[in-house]
C-alpha cells in the first residue's frame, strides 16, 4: 500500500500537516476550496522563476494568510517590497473581492533537499533537451551533498525521444514508504518536450520523526566525559613452545 498511495496524503495527521488550514460550513466550503486553487495557480503562474517549494494558506474570518516557501525570496519580494504588493493586487483581482491578504515569504534553507525544487530542476533540464540520465545523476549528487537519508527519482514518457514510452527510476539510500513516521517529501512535475510530456516524480527521505524525541533530548542531562583508557599491550608468544 505504501508504494502506491500518495506519500503526503498517507501521512496527514501523523507526520504531515495540511497545506490549507481553515474551517467552513458545507455551504461555503466549495467556494473557499476553489479560492485556494485559484490562489495557488496565480502564485505558481506569476512566480514561475522564483523556485516555489510550497504554498500554505490559512484563513481567519475575512483575512487570508499566505505563506510562500521559496528558494529565491528576493524575486518574490522585489525591490522595496514591490513584488509583494503586485502579488497582493493580482490576488485581489483574481478573487474578485477586496480581501485582506497577508503574505509571508519564507526562504527554503536546504534547496537541494526539497522534493519540489529537485523536480522543478529536472523538468527545466529535460525541456532543454538534456539527457535524462545525466540530469537524474546530477540531482542525486546534489541531494547527497545536502545530506538526505535517501532519494528516489522516477521519469516516465518518451525518454530521449524514444518511439516507445517507458519508465525508469533511480534510488540512492533508504526511502521507506511503508513507515508512517518516516519524513518523506514528495513532488510530481511534468516536462513539456518536443516529443511529448514527461512525468517526473521525486521522493526524498529526510529521517524518522519520533514523537517526544525533542522533549527527551532537551530533558536529558549532558553526557559525562569518558575517562581515557590505558593503551593495551599485546605480546606475541606464537614462537614459544
UniProtKB/Swiss-Prot annotation:
Keyword Ribosomal protein tagged: yes
GO molecular function terms attached to this record: mRNA binding; rRNA binding; structural constituent of ribosome
Gene3D superfamilies membership: 3.30.300.20, Ribosomal protein S3, C-terminal domain
Annotated segments matching region Disordered: 215-241
Entry superkingdom: Bacteria
GO cellular component terms given for this protein: cytosolic small ribosomal subunit
Keywords for the protein's UniProt record, in alphabetical order: Ribonucleoprotein, Ribosomal protein, RNA-binding, rRNA-binding
Listed GO biological process terms: translation
Protein's UniProt keywords contain Ribosomal protein: yes
Protein family: Belongs to the universal ribosomal protein uS3 family.
Subunit structure as annotated in this protein's UniProt entry: Part of the 30S ribosomal subunit. Forms a tight complex with proteins S10 and S14.
Entry protein name: Small ribosomal subunit protein uS3
Gene: rpsC
Amino acid at each position: 500500500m505504501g508504494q502506491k498511495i500518495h506519500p503526503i496524503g498517507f501521512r496527514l495527521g501523523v507526520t504531515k500537516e495540511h497545506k490549507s488550514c481553515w474551517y467552513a460550513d458545507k455551504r461555503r466550503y466549495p467556494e473557499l476550496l476553489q479560492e485556494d486553487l485559484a490562489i495557488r495557480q496565480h502564485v505558481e503562474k506569476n512566480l514561475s522563476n522564483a523556485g516555489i517549494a510550497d504554498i500554505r494558506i490559512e484563513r481567519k474570518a475575512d483575512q487570508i494568510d499566505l505563506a510562500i516557501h521559496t528558494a529565491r525570496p528576493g524575486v518574490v519580494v522585489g525591490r522595496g517590497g514591490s513584488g509583494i504588493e503586485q502579488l497582493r493586487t493580482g490576488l485581489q483581482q483574481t478573487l474578485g473581492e477586496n480581501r485582506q491578504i497577508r503574505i509571508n515569504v519564507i526562504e527554503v534553507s536546504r534547496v537541494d533537499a526539497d522534493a519540489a525544487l529537485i523536480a522543478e530542476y529536472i523538468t527545466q533540464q529535460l525541456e532543454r533537451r538534456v539527457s535524462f540520465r545525466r540530469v537524474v545523476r546530477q540531482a542525486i549528487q546534489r541531494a547527497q551533498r545536502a545530506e538526505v537519508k535517501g532519494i528516489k527519482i522516477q521519469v516516465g514518457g518518451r525518454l530521449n525521444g524514444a518511439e516507445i514510452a517507458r519508465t525508469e527510476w533511480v534510488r540512492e539510500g533508504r526511502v521507506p514508504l511503508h513507515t508512517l513516521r518516516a519524513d518523506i517529501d514528495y513532488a510530481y512535475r511534468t516536462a513539456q518536450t518536443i516529443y511529448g510530456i514527461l512525468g517526473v516524480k521525486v521522493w526524498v527521505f529526510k529521517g524518522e520523526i519520533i514523537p517526544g524525541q525533542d522533549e527527551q533530548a532537551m530533558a536529558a542531562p549532558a553526557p559525562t566525559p569518558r575517562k581515557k583508557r590505558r593503551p593495551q599491550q599485546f605480546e606475541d608468544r606464537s614462537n614459544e613452545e
